[in-house]
């Protein structure tokens, strides 16, 4: 797991995350993705990645928010290193409420079995970079990985904009 920033309450990182996640600042998410990709590419972390896969939002959440912040981060990263983005193979088929005030156990239960793979053939044999905005307990990412488990010859790396300290 590569975490670009460290999230602490009342910090500038919290402000940045809230800006692009809750205040519709899509361009900030794209910009952070570009900055991260420049650093990761310079340090050789993206050389063998084939495909970016942002953690999907449920369609209802997508309508509420207007965009997927993880997809916007991926778009910024792709503008630097020109990797394709797959937004249709991994899907979130169950709507869940926000995890921000849930315990680790509640988070794990909240996202259990909410992801599935619609197009495993698009991912088979590839090295993907699974992209999310914030890593807190890892429940969301672990459930994404669980959904991807049966895709043949799939290598998964993970990038998050920030991790909670």
Predicted regions, residues:
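Extended interfacial segments that mediate partner engagement and assembly in macromolecular machines
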Residues: 1-76
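A local structural micro-motif
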Residues: 25, 48-49, 85-86, 156-157
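Short, well-ordered alpha-helices that flank and scaffold nucleotide-derived cofactor binding pockets
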Residues: 38-42, 75, 79, 142, ...
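A short coil-to-beta-strand element that immediately follows conserved catalytic motifs
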Residues: 51, 81-91
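PRPP/pyrophosphate-binding module of the type I phosphoribosyltransferase fold
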Residues: 87-165
